[in-house]
Amino acid sequence: MNFKFVAGLEIHVQLNTKTKMFCSCPTEGPDIPNTRVCPVCLGYPGTLPVLNREAVVMAIALGKALHGHINNISRFHRKNYFYPDLPKGYQITQGDVPIIENAYLELSTGKKIPIKRIHLEEDAAKSVHVSSTGRLSGAEETLLDFNRSGIPLIEIVTDPVFESPEEAALFVEELQATLRYLGISNAQMELGQLRCDVNVSVELDGKEGTRVEIKNLNSIRAIRQALSYEYNRHVDAYKRGEIIPQETLAFDEKTNQTPPMRTKQTSEDYRYFPEPDLPPLVLTSDLFEEADKYSGSFLEAYKNALQWIGKESEARTLALNKDQYLMYATFAKEGFDTKLLTRIITIDLPNILSEVGKGWNEINQSYISAILNLQQRGEITAAVAKDLLWQAARDIDPIKYAQEHQLLGKKDLDLEQVISEVLEQNPDAVEKYKKGNVNVVSFLLGQVMKKTKGTADPGETRKLLEERLTKLSE
C-alpha cells in the first residue's frame, strides 16, 4: 500500500484598513464588545454597502507581490448560510470572478506554490463561548461581538500541492512574512488576523482519497499537528478497510486530535448569486499606482540575510522578523562588518529587548549605530558593547554612559594569543586531554578567564580551546 499526503489551504487575512469593508466603522478601537458597529455591519434591512477603496488597493498590491493575474473587472456575490455570527444571513464575497487568479508564492526552498485565487470578502462576528474550554461543546451560552463583523478580509486559496505538513506550515509562515513586508496585514494568528483552513486527503496507490476540511487553525504548530494527525488517521483507516467520510473537522490542541464539526458543505449548499447592491469592481490605473506604496519581499530579505550570515536557519529567522531585518539591512548598507552585525543584531540585542519588554521599533537606532561604530573601530570590547546595548534599550545614551564610566579605549584582547600562553604554561593539562580527559577544558577555561580578568567570552573561549586541543591531539 502506497500512501501520499495531499493538502490545500484556504487562508483568511484581516487587512490593515482604517474602516470596515462596506461601512465607515473603525477597524480598531476600545476592546469593548459591540461598540464599533452600525446598521450596515449589523445587517439591518434597507442598508446598502459601500466598498472600501483601500482594501481593493491592498488586494492589488498582494496580487503584484504574488505574481498573480489581476482581473480588471471582478464581481461580488452573496454566500448564503445561517449562523448567529452572520446577521444578514449571507456573506458578501467574490464568486466566479475574483480580483486575483493564478498567482504563486515562491518558498525559501525554491518551490513555487500555485495560488488558485485571492478574493475580497467581509468577516463575520466573533463568537465567544462561555465555558471552561472556550469551545462551543459544553458551553453554557455563546456571546457575539459584532466589532469584527464587516472587517475587510482577503481569502487566499492554494491548489492541493502540499506534500507534507511541514511544507504547508512553511507556506503559511512565509506568506505571513510576505503580508507583513507589504504592510497590508499584521497577520498575527494568535489575534485571529490570519486564520487557516486546510483540505487534506490521502491517496492510496494513486487513487484520490476522501477530502476533509479542518477549520480555524490558529498557529503554525497547530497546522503541523493537525495535518500530521489527520494523515495518520487516514492511513490507519485505509489499512483497516474503513471509509473516511467527507466532513468538516475542528482541531483540539490539548489532545492533538480532530473531532468532527459537521458534514462538509459544497458550493451548491451556499447558493451563490451576484450581489445586487454592488456593481462590478472595475480597476482603474490610479488604483494600481496607489498599490505601489505597499512593497517588500520576504524572499528577497531571506536571500540578502543568507548572503550576510551564511547559515540558512539563522538567515530565515532574521528575514521572518521584518523590523529586525530592516535594522540589520540598514547597518549592512552603511558598511558595518556582517560578523559584528550578526552578533549584535541577531544574538545580543534580541535577548536584551526581550528582557526589557521592547520591540525593534522602540529602540533608538542611532544608539545602536554609535555602539557598532565604537566596536568596529576597536574602541570597546564585545563585553562593553553588550553593556552599552543594555543602556540603549533603557533609553540611556550609550556614548555618555561609556564616557562617564570610563569604558572607552578598552580594546578586545587577542584571545588566540592568551589561549596559546595558557596551553604553554599548562603542559600537564594538555597531556591529560590527549589521553581522553576532557574535563581539563574547564580548568584551562578558568585560566584564560583569570588572565583576561573575566573579559573573554566563555562560550567562544571554550570553543577555541577545544579546537586547539583537538589539533594538538592529532
Swiss-Prot record:
Annotated function? Allows the formation of correctly charged Asn-tRNA(Asn) or Gln-tRNA(Gln) through the transamidation of misacylated Asp-tRNA(Asn) or Glu-tRNA(Gln) in organisms which lack either or both of asparaginyl-tRNA or glutaminyl-tRNA synthetases. The reaction takes place in the presence of glutamine and ATP through an activated phospho-Asp-tRNA(Asn) or phospho-Glu-tRNA(Gln).
SMART domains for the chain: GatB_Yqey
What EC number(s) has UniProt assigned to this enzyme? 6.3.5.-
Which GO terms label this protein's molecular function in UniProt?
asparaginyl-tRNA synthase (glutamine-hydrolyzing) activity; ATP binding; glutaminyl-tRNA synthase (glutamine-hydrolyzing) activity
Q: What class of enzyme is it?
A: ligase
Tell me the subunit arrangement.
Answer: Heterotrimer of A, B and C subunits.
Name the record gives this protein: Aspartyl/glutamyl-tRNA(Asn/Gln) amidotransferase subunit B
What are the entry keywords? ATP-binding, Ligase, Nucleotide-binding, Protein biosynthesis
Species the sequence originates in: Coprothermobacter proteolyticus (strain ATCC 35245 / DSM 5265 / OCM 4 / BT)
Output the GO biological process annotations, alphabetical, semicolon-separated. Answer: translation
Q: From what superkingdom does this record's organism come?
A: Bacteria
Q: Which family does it belong to?
A: Belongs to the GatB/GatE family. GatB subfamily.
Q: Which reaction does it catalyse?
A: L-glutamyl-tRNA(Gln) + L-glutamine + ATP + H2O = L-glutaminyl-tRNA(Gln) + L-glutamate + ADP + phosphate + H(+); L-aspartyl-tRNA(Asn) + L-glutamine + ATP + H2O = L-asparaginyl-tRNA(Asn) + L-glutamate + ADP + phosphate + 2 H(+)
